[in-house]
Regions:
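PLP-dependent amino-acid enzyme catalytic core
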Residues: 1-148
Length: 148
């Protein structure tokens, strides 16, 4: 599967290339083509299985996604269900603050180091990756904790 830049269909990348490169050469984001996924099959699955199936679907050249999901999330969130859906009166609230820094960004930033490591393996890359952040909010802390 190839990802395309949001600014040009002619700029493409595999999942591993997109993860390592970050942005497309034209400054656009890499997006995947819309492909069918059996959403009904995910309805009664636990969070780890859902994450594994969705990420495997979107990133087919990354192997052992189940192991990456386990390493990213197991034991790092307050609840087994990473982002529990909690009834509040006649409505539901998705709790996105159960991660290590209590920021919604923990969901993505705990997975990012696993994906970077897997992408390096796919590309046969041995160089270290330098992550530089600057923030006035919770993003930097969430990124730092994700990489610890």
């Amino acid at each position: 599967m190839y990802y395309h830049s949001t600014r040009s269909d002619s700029i493409t990348a595999t999942a591993a290339q997109g993860i390592l490169q970050g942005l497309a050469s034209d400054g656009g984001l890499f997006i995947s083509p819309l492909t069918a996924l059996d959403w009904e099959d995910l309805m009664d699955r636990d969070t780890f299985t859902m994450a594994t199936k969705i990420l495997s679907h979107l990133l087919p050249d990354v192997e052992h996604m189940d192991r990456l999901v386990e390493q990213a999330y197991r034991g790092k969130f307050e609840t087994e269900d990473l982002t529990p859906l909690v009834p509040v009166g006649d409505r539901f609230v998705l709790e996105l603050f159960r991660g290590p820094t209590s920021a919604f960004k923990d969901v993505a930033l705990c997975m990012l180091p696993q994906l970077l490591t897997a992408a390096k393996t796919v590309k046969g890359m041995e160089e270290d990756i330098l992550i530089l952040t600057a923030t006035s909010g919770d993003t930097g802390k969430a990124a730092l904790v994700g990489f610890q």
